[in-house]
């Protein structure tokens, strides 16, 4: 495994946040995820230890808005960090993507949907509860898109 960034800061014109997040993801990958990856794949095991590390690093809340206590990263910053994680543990990168997409669906993407005031308030209240669970307790979310009959 290489220990240099796949996204060279100057060539990619990374923002400070993008640089910090990719560095953080690479550090976790090198020091924690890489050694566990083969076991997770061989044993078809969920990478729970890696999720504990992601939670400790604040990365479970990468796309949770800052006003809720998250890192408030945009999609590009998230994608760059995910690519770094994928270099070290595919299972973690794949499942983390599902988790982050759940945050995006309930966050910025949902904000663009038409909702009446009552529904929007209920959505915001519910989303705040889920964000707190992620940030405080390390809750992991995903959506059932690949299961038969689950999507419209």
Model-found features: residue ranges?
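Glycine-rich flavin
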Residues: 48-55, 61-152
């Amino acid at each position: 495994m290489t220990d240099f960034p796949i996204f060279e800061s100057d060539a990619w014109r990374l923002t400070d946040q993008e640089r910090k997040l990719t560095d953080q993801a690479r550090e976790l990958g090198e020091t924690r995820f890489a050694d566990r990856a083969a076991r997770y794949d061989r044993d078809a095991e969920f990478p729970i230890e890696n999720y504990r590390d992601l939670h400790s690093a604040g990365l479970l809340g990468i796309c949770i808005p800052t006003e809720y206590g998250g890192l408030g990263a945009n999609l590009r910053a998230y994608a760059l960090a995910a690519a770094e994680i994928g270099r070290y543990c595919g299972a973690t990168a794949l499942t983390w993507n599902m988790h982050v997409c759940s945050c995006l669906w309930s966050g910025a993407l949902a904000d663009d949907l038409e909702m009446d005031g009552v529904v929007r308030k209920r959505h915001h209240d519910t989303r705040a509860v889920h964000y707190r669970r992620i940030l405080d307790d390390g809750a992991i979310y995903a959506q059932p898109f690949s299961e038969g009959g689950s999507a419209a």
